[in-house]
């Protein structure tokens, strides 16, 4: 089969589509012929050597995919050759085939494109996990979702909206702010020219929010804590703004705040299956009905993965960037 292989050129990663060894699959797994995958920040970091895959996981990039079932393991009864599916992956998505545990698969709606299917698993499950399972977001509460124009952001805004929460968000361009408002954000703040903590406190008459979902990290920590209500939660899912920061424990103790660090990729198979099932019960019907939807910015052929990575690295995308695999 073919897959994207990472090679170094003057310490810069070069992504090449070339022949690699075929993969095997276990009795509880399904072999899927991939039609589309997607670019995530984790892929950019892994390509540069900063985010190695968990032990035992394929070194091939790609944390999600859509495709066609090509073969099933002996223990698999609920999937058949030819089924259209999508799934969260620990790795291996930038390839022609991948092996997936059968309980991680979701059926791709007939009206959906391969690109739409590949735009869902990683970011929608990440947003669901951290807003509703870790963050315990409830109807009537207020949430600040940073990086609202990202894949996780565009998914999170919609799910929070549908759950009955008031949504605030940050983004770095007028286009992204407009899209966030269209998706349901009550207030979209340009972090490049506005103080988001001041804007949030003004918009909430000094009350703040119940939950902050933050992929930025260190540089936002103090402001995030400042705007949280009593018993508020800060869920940290990234370190784009740095790993370290001073913390005012007075805010944490005085308001009984919780700071939660959360990653999806490193969780056990059992945890991922549980998260997938809960997401399917709560939000899959809304996706099928078109009440919420994956936001896709651009689609690249897989042979242009290098250009797709640069596009995401430059923060040009609103929503997901997809890689499609041509079927010969």
Q: Each predicted region: which residue ranges?
A:
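Short amphipathic alpha-helix with an adjacent loop that forms part of the alpha/beta core around
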Residues: 196-206
